[in-house]
Structures are given as structure tokens and as C-alpha cells.
Amino acid sequence: MIHFRKAVEADAPRITTIYANARRFMAASGNPNQWIDGYPSEADVRVDISADVLWTACRGDEILAVFALIEGPDPTYAIIQGAWLNDRPYAVVHRLASSGKVGGIGEICLRWCLDRFDTLRVDTHADNRVMQRTLIRMGFVYTGIIFCHNGTPRLAYQLDRR
């Protein structure tokens, strides 16, 4: 059975390995540019843990997936080429990655997030077809393009269950 828990400092090396494996998977899937230069690094993981926003999906003691779940507003979402569905309070899912051991774990994580927040916003790289398919299948709506803190564009999606 899959359960969710906040990440703790002791999880940082394992989570860093999951992110490294995710970077390799993305590159092999035609998405070599979304997470570059070792991002997210172990230092990034530790920042998310310290901020109390990093979650893990686990089976027993094994971490199957990791993601940051952050209540908005997100500064990078303030300007969008397009339009959000609404201005309701929302949460953002960032840095979702799978260990690769359970198919569909990304969707399981997003559904868990939707059980906690009526409105979710997510962004992804234009080359991340896997994430785009998951978001569309779940009912997320493409809303436009946002720009990351480093200026790179991302496709923006929103799902509002209200």
C-alpha cells in the first residue's frame, strides 16, 4: 500500500538519487533540457525539506516518488502568457519525480494533492511529453506559458475541482 509522508533529512541522499534517475529518464524520453546542471541537487532537496514542502510517496520504507507541494501564490506564476482559469487560492506541485518502480505513481501523487487542495497549478517543459499526457488525462487544462526564475519557458496547467 502506498502512503505519503513529509521528507526528512535522512531521505535527502535517496531523493537525490531519484532525481538523478529522473534526469536520465527524461533525457532518454526526449526531454534533456528540463532539469539541467544537476538540478534538483541535494542542496535543493535539503532546502525543500527545511521549508517543510517536500513529500514522498512510499511503500513501506521505500520511496517511490517525491514532489514539492507548495501553497500559492507562486511568484513565477504571477505573469503568464495566457490566462489562469481563475484567481482562486491554489497549491503548486513542483519537482515531481518517480523512482520508476511503480507505473502511474505521478498520477497517484497528483490525485493525493487534489484530495488536499481544490485547485492545483503545475508547469512542465515543452519536451516533457510524459508529464503533459498525465496532466491532460487527469483533466488539467493548458493555460499558457510561464517563465522559471532562470527565464526558461514552461507550459502551465491548472485543474480546479470546484
Q: For each of these PLM feature ranges, what is it?
A:
Residues I2, D61-V66, A91:
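Glycine-rich phosphate/pyrophosphate-binding loop shared by adenosine-nucleotide-utilizing enzymes
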Residues H3-T17:
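A short beta-loop-alpha structural element at the N-terminal edge
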Residues R23-D44:
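Conserved GNAT-fold acetyl-CoA-binding loop/helix
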Residues T56, E62-G72:
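Conserved beta-strand in the GNAT
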Residues A68-K101:
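Conserved acyl-donor/pantetheine-binding loop and adjacent beta-alpha core of acyl/acetyltransferases
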Residues K101-D115, R133-R137:
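Conserved acetyl-CoA-binding loop-helix of GNAT-fold acetyltransferases
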Residues R116-D127:
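Conserved GNAT acetyl-CoA-binding A-motif
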Residues D123, V141-L155:
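Conserved catalytic-core motifs of GNAT/GCN5-like acyltransferases
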